[in-house]
């Protein structure tokens, strides 16, 4: 069990405004909803590719959450591979895992983003997701995500 003081530190860290942007928490009672040993961050696909200074974000997370490493696995999604490769040793040292749904698949098709978002959003296995918006209104991130998922579904429908 994580010590109460460390829980408060994590709470303050997640609720505070980072120098590199704004963390949007969808659930203020998230401390009661941590699942086992996992904190999940989801960098929405659109800003992760075009708007977010990903390297600064990861360095910030690593510095902030090193003390939490014995208690949680911090998991990142939608991390462009160039950032993951550059920061692999730093991520590993802080037990930060990443999943890159943009990596090129062997058959050359666009990797399915649908399964990733459904698994992250709906599966009880994962903890509450904290979306890091970085000066982009969350409503627009949601619109981009819905549009992209719709686009992928349409492409799958056309080819099936």
From Swiss-Prot:
Its main location: membrane. It comes from Saccharomyces cerevisiae (strain ATCC 204508 / S288c). One of its GO terms (cellular component) is membrane. Keywords: Membrane, Transmembrane, Transmembrane helix. Belongs to the UPF0479 family. It is a multi-pass membrane protein. It is found in: Membrane. The chain crosses the membrane at residues 39-59, 136-156. This is Putative UPF0479 protein YLR466C-A. Completely overlaps YRF1-4.
